[in-house]
Amino acid sequence: MLAQDQDIIASNLAAVEEHFHSEAANDIERALELYTDDIVWEAPARNLVFRGKKDVADNYRKLFASIREVEFRNLQRFATEDRVVDDSIVTFELTRDGFLPLQVGQKVEMRLAHIFEMRGGKISKEIAFEMWRPV
């Protein structure tokens, strides 16, 4: 592997790490900076697809207004020059209706697998596979 390829992979991993850190800190604006303008965000289990930074931003603000006490625990993460795959467990408490079919106040543990497509050190597509359960 060329040193340039290793640098690209390291940059991709750093961008995804910063993205998750920003989400956990509820710094949505910083998380959005790590997306390309033509970002596509998908959550297949909930049949959701958002295109473009504005629509993704609206979804993120709604989603993160619906949860609190967010904690990420990374299980594994690896990358290539154009992809990052992440497997994590995220825990949170629901604060409003509309995100998951559970009652407000419910604590949730979610196994969250992501495939990120990367371009120029930013996320151009995020596919989030969500497997949740009340705890």
Model-identified regions with their sequence ranges:
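A short gly/proline-enriched turn/hairpin at secondary-structure junctions
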Residues: 34, 40-51, 62-65
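Short, well-ordered alpha-helical segments enriched in acidic and aromatic residues
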Residues: 15, 25-42
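A beta-strand edge to alpha-helix "cap/lid" segment located at domain peripheries
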Residues: 2-11, 21, 27, 42, ...
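Hydrophobic (often cysteine-bearing) scaffold residues that line and stabilize catalytic clefts
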Residues: 12, 52
